[in-house]
Amino acid sequence: MKLTVLGGGGVRSAFLAKSLAYNAHRIGLTEVVFLDSSAENLTIFGEIARYVFNAIRPDIHFSVTSDPVPALKNSHYVITTLRVGGDESRIRDERIALAHNTLGQETTGAGGFAMAMRSIPAILHYCRLIEEHAAEDAIL
């Protein structure tokens, strides 16, 4: 089974790669693709993730790409780890909230709400691509 990670160029990608590698047998993984719109992030964090994954499971194909079509083609599982707007948007969201004496945390506070609103168009875009290119029974 193929698994695709949307946002695979994030700073925590190596940790996700390690967990996937150690648990690949549980879901029958045969291929893992880390996708990110930032080629720069993929060059750094995606390649670290590839190294970690291949050190544990060299028998499973692992790749990184910034092209969503081949990344999603025939994928059975899709994980989203997107941060639309990058770290700059997170910092701005949290500072705006804090300036108004409000919790700015990126998942539960005003920063999280801002991130969710910013993410909707990207998630809808990927959902259309998943519907078109992923396996018919893909799980998002």
Q: What is each PLM-predicted segment?
A:
Residues 61-74:
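Short acidic low-complexity segments
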Residues 3-32:
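N-terminal Rossmann-like dinucleotide-binding module
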Residues 2, 30-31, 61, 139:
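Residues at the starts of beta-strands that form the adenosine-phosphate
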Residues 73, 79-80:
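Redox-cofactor binding/interface segments in oxidoreductases and associated redox assembly factors
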Residues 25-52:
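NAD(P)-binding Rossmann-fold cofactor-contacting core
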